[in-house]
UniProtKB/Swiss-Prot annotation:
Pfam families: Rad60-SLD_2. It is a lipid-anchor. It comes from Arabidopsis thaliana (Mouse-ear cress). Residues 118-120 form a propeptide. InterPro entries: MUB, Ubiquitin-like_dom, Ubiquitin-like_domsf, UBL3-like, UBL3-like_ubiquitin_dom. Keywords: Cell membrane, Lipoprotein, Membrane, Methylation, Palmitate, Prenylation. Ubiquitous. This is Membrane-anchored ubiquitin-fold protein 5. The modification Cysteine methyl ester is found at residue 117. GO terms for cellular component: plasma membrane. Residues 7-72 form the Ubiquitin-like domain. PANTHER family: MEMBRANE-ANCHORED UBIQUITIN-FOLD PROTEIN 5, UBIQUITIN-LIKE PROTEIN 3 HCG-1 PROTEIN.
């Protein structure tokens, strides 16, 4: 793999801190890139993601799909067009869906099944 196959990326977290920059193969999938981001997540940050489905990568206003490679995403957006330029991608965390549902059920009072209709 030559240098022309590598893309230099850094990842901007929601609080403004960065992961990287590092070089990645343009043939790497977005899903494996997310796994690397999770592995490099700063240890001092709260709410670190555990699964790739909790991470969204945004570049050029587009959310990158897990099954695409970086070279496929390059055709949709501008990634590393100029040599020596570091491309910044934004990292957005999405809490797992089942946690939201569990939290909502715990916070909501139990519903009573009686009618509140009034017929006049």
């Amino acid at each position: 793999m030559g240098d022309e196959d590598l893309i230099e990326l850094k990842f901007r977290l929601a609080d403004g801190t960065d992961i990287g920059p590092s070089k990645y193969s343009q043939f790497m999938t977005v899903a494996s890139l997310k796994e690397k981001i999770i592995a490099q997540w700063p240890k001092d940050k709260e709410n670190a993601p555990k699964m790739i489905n909790e991470v969204k990568l945004i570049n050029g206003g587009k959310i990158l799909e897990n099954n695409k490679t970086l070279s496929e995403a390059r055709s949709l957006i501008t990634i590393g067009e100029l040599p020596g330029i570091v491309t910044t991608m934004h990292v957005v965390l999405r809490p797992p869906l089942f946690e939201k549902k569990k939290e909502k059920l715990q916070n909501d009072p139990p519903r009573k099944s009686h009618c509140v209709c009034c017929i006049l």
